[in-house]
A protein has these predicted regions:
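Surface-exposed, interaction-prone regions used to assemble/regulate multi-protein complexes
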Residues: 1-134
Length: 134
């Protein structure tokens, strides 16, 4: 049995963010595990994702940390339903005049849009889950 390592991936360019998006597609996110800290300009997601980088297809608890976030908006997400499970499909990036718009696309047309000063996103694995259920 080989050693298993937890990863930390930092994105500072559009190409880097595409890699994080690919790693996190089909990740499960509980609505109560989404946090925006406006004073710190940080947006956090605690996700359960498949380890697509290995062949064993295990689940990993990870944190996606978006920094330098000026604002956050959501569409079609009930903020009062803390038990709602979202499935992250992709993370998209759009350049605006003086900033970036990061869009988190979830299944069933649910969207979170982040307005960022720069691209500074970290995907950090926390724990490998033995049980394949979310």
């Amino acid at each position: 049995m080989g050693k298993r390592f937890l990863k930390k991936i930092i994105a500072q360019s559009p190409q880097d963010l595409k890699f994080i998006s690919a790693c996190c597609s089909e990740a499960k996110v509980k609505n109560s595990d989404i946090k925006y800290l406006p004073l710190n300009k940080i947006f956090l997601l605690s996700i359960s994702r498949f380890n697509k980088e290995s062949d064993n297809n295990e689940r990993i608890n990870s944190i996606i940390r978006f920094e330098f976030i000026q604002s956050s908006k959501s569409k079609n997400i009930d903020q009062n339903n803390f038990d709602l499970i979202l499935e992250l499909l992709a993370i998209n990036l759009f350049k605006r005049k003086n900033n970036f718009e990061i869009t988190l696309l979830f299944s069933k047309n649910k969207i979170i849009t982040l307005n960022a000063e720069v691209i500074e996103v970290t995907l950090e694995d926390q724990k490998i889950i033995n049980d394949k259920k979310f």
